[in-house]
Curated annotation (Swiss-Prot):
Any one Gene Ontology molecular-function term assigned to this protein's record: rRNA binding
PROSITE patterns according to UniProt: RIBOSOMAL_L9 (PS00651)
Family to which this protein belongs: Belongs to the bacterial ribosomal protein bL9 family.
Biological source species: Aeromonas salmonicida (strain A449)
Lineage of the species this protein comes from: Bacteria, Pseudomonadati, Pseudomonadota, Gammaproteobacteria, Aeromonadales
Designated name of the protein: Large ribosomal subunit protein bL9
GO biological process: translation
Known role: Binds to the 23S rRNA.
Length: 148
């Protein structure tokens, strides 16, 4: 199925690209999320008319993400306190929601979906966590897990 992308999508393309995707991906994700429209003649003409507006919107979103990334870069290590055993092993774990809540409490609003962690944190110590604020903008935050 041919679609026109209205946003930059990782491993697929950028704004205005006409790409072929599987029908289910288009119908169930791209079109309902407003990230693409079907590539019909009418939609192509409409897109060409709105291209400058969409590019400005995309640039504004990226600028806002870069501003948030600068604020994240200024943060000192974010401290998360959790119950732990004598050897530093946590009772439970710290996931993306806990990290996002701690960063938001430190003064920069971050959503759970923006936090990128390979695994949950299960031990005390210092970790580097990547926060993906935009398709092109990433920031690294120091997270320090301490025992209560």
């Amino acid at each position: 199925m041919q679609v026109i992308l209205l946003d930059k999508i990782a491993k697929l393309g950028g704004l205005g690209d006409q790409v072929a995707v599987k029908a289910g991906y288009a119908r169930n994700y791209l079109i309902p999320q407003g990230k693409a429209v079907m590539a019909t003649k009418a939609n192509i003409e409409t897109f060409d008319a709105r291209r400058a507006e969409l590019e400005a919107k995309l640039a504004a979103g990226k600028a806002a993400a870069e501003e948030r990334a600068a604020k994240l870069g200024e943060l000192a290590a974010v401290v998360i306190a959790s119950k732990a055993g004598d050897e530093g092993k946590l009772f439970g774990s710290i996931g993306t929601r806990d990290v996002a809540d701690a960063i938001t409490a430190a003064g920069v609003a971050v959503a759970k979906s923006e936090v990128r962690m390979g695994n949950v944190l299960r031990n005390t110590g210092e970790y580097e966590v990547v926060v993906q604020l935009h398709a092109d903008v990433k920031a690294t935050v120091q997270v320090q897990v301490v025992a209560l």
